[in-house]
């Protein structure tokens, strides 16, 4: 929606999976967009996770002079303000929508006989013998002797259902105002077994504590749950289900009976065999559960001794917990044997799918917390036709995260899919101990901002800004900090006395220049990377592990700057 309504914004949707269809936004072809929600910088996932009913307004900053004040990696900015309570009686609102989702354009596929016709044509052009005979084509239409006529597209794709509900309450008095919102979103994909659920909660409270002293407190949270088969629908993933639909051959049946049991059919390709139906229902699962809590606190004091002078402190604390669980489930399929010129009856052989014959269970957990502080002084006043605004701000951001996970092989009972049931052995009896993993990280950035706004008679505008940013990504005081200036001039033509076009209510000419900076590197590349090598040296008659610099650091790394 934003991409269609705001000039210079392009949106590219790379996936249609429930809960993963967020568009990638760019401004005038440039990435590096930041998102500021209620004055605090947030991630793209936080922006995408907002309930639309919580949003009061969205502003877009597109040029360098406007975003220079936001510093690190800011080539453009979305400024989001969430709803606040009004001085009025309590109002309760409900909105709800239910819709369906289908592929925008139904693809046309060759059926079995058509595939046979064009395959034979290609063989003849190469000087080879035809493979498919008239009798084979007849059997495809009749579905006998192992032949079939399956439209895998119709078998896999259906109709998804999307529902969204929100209830909110707002109100207040001169002293205190509130806004509270609860939302629920559920999406079921047009491929079965894909499901996304999200619950949003937001509460904003604004209070006048004393004359000139105001308090704002915002608390929000959301829970996101995703369910999918082990094979995803992401176009970048190996053996994704839409890809399997494209590769599956149409002249087979979708199921095959063998020794009194019904199996899903798999067809060979130039790589691994594909079995779209089995990949949806029998490959296992991929589940995730993410919990987000965000708080925003600000205290503002309008000084009585100087009109227009305000002091403000704003802080935010974010906490994220994540859990994922993946089960790779072995499943048997009937793999079709490719026909040749001597084939009369299409044959199949029973084997495990591409996921092999041993179950694999993986679980991981993550935790991240982020602290943001902003201390600012602002001055806004008007002297006749002259308006002036000054901002001085200091900002810090710190993020700490931890991740751990375990992958185990072998389960005696696939229904008991818990890590304490892992056997550590493959079906053939080969030992494969559980593999643990873990990591942690810490990031810190700081910045100082100065900005001057001036306008004369609401016709001529000047804005100048200067930001001094520091990042943990670079070493040494000479490389860690960067200074980012910005300057813009504007002329509101429609406010001139000689402008009489009443049908134009806002005509503005603006020019700006500014410097932005991006990091674009992994942490600690300014230091040497040390690696270990076992059994590299002998000390005291015993082999020892050696430590050596595998990658030399570059102490001269610094910000990539753009004017």
Segments the model singles out, each with a brief description of its role:
Residues 1-4, 13-16, 22-29, 38-46, ...:
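Short, polar/charged loop or turn motifs at beta-strand boundaries
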Residues 2, 9, 58-59, 78-80:
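Non-catalytic regulatory/gating segments with a bias toward low-complexity or hydrophobic composition
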Residues 4-5, 38-68:
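Short acidic/polar hinge/loop motifs at secondary-structure boundaries
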Residues 5-8, 16-23, 33, 76-77, ...:
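Residues embedded in well-ordered regular secondary structure
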Residues 12-21, 48-53, 70-74, 194-197, ...:
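Short, glycine-/polar-rich solvent-exposed loops and beta-turns at beta-strand/coil boundaries
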Residues 13, 27-31, 62, 82-84, ...:
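Flexible glycine-/small-residue-rich
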Residues 41-42, 130, 262-264, 387:
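Short, solvent-exposed loop/turn motifs
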Residues 163, 198, 204-213, 218-223, ...:
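Extracellular/periplasmic, surface-exposed regions of secreted and cell-surface proteins
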